Amino acid sequence: MSDKLKQFKLLIVLSLFLLAIPLYFTYNHFRQSSALKESFEKNERIEVLHRLTSSEKYASDIRKAGYTIPSDGAIRLDGVIYPLEIEGDLHLKISPPKEDAKDFQLFFITQVNEKQTHVAFILDKNLNLIDSSYSQQNDNGKREIVSVSQSEEDYLLKSVQSEIDAFMKKMYQTLYG
């Protein structure tokens, strides 16, 4: 009788253990998903970008929303989604921000003074410009740093801000309906 009781207790402990494993993973998935929604609602753009691009977890949702990202194999190989492409007026390429980052980088190509210009922006959490870089190809085929007018930079910044805001709204709609 004692043997059957021990077996029964062991069976209960084993069942509880096996039940706890999927519950843990379900809870962890829910916690991560709710943290992303909370970041969206608090308008923490860098945190949202980090969570969306830090793994392949949201890759299908990003594609479903109409944005261009690398293949799943490339994402697994790199460990992040790089680049996240927003194909608006400027065709932005966003680098994935690191965890707890205070800023993030993006790149695009545009026309300045009728010449193709490569642009790099570093933006803070409020999409304010921290730093910028502009380069054009010279007659020798080498890239050289150029400067642009303040009005041109302001115009480009406003365009970038509106495209990122539109991305945030569309991703929120895609994920949370």
Predicted regions span which residues?
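Basic, mixed-charge low-complexity alpha-helical segments
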Residues: V13, R31-S34, S162
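Compositionally biased, intrinsically disordered low-complexity segments enriched
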Residues: K9, R31, H118-A120
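Short, Lys/Arg-rich N-terminal segment immediately upstream of the first membrane anchor
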Residues: M1-Q7
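N-terminal export/targeting and maturation segments
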Residues: P22-D100
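Hydrophobic membrane-insertion alpha-helices, especially the h-region
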Residues: K9-F25
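Extracytoplasmic electrostatic interaction patches
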Residues: Y82-G177
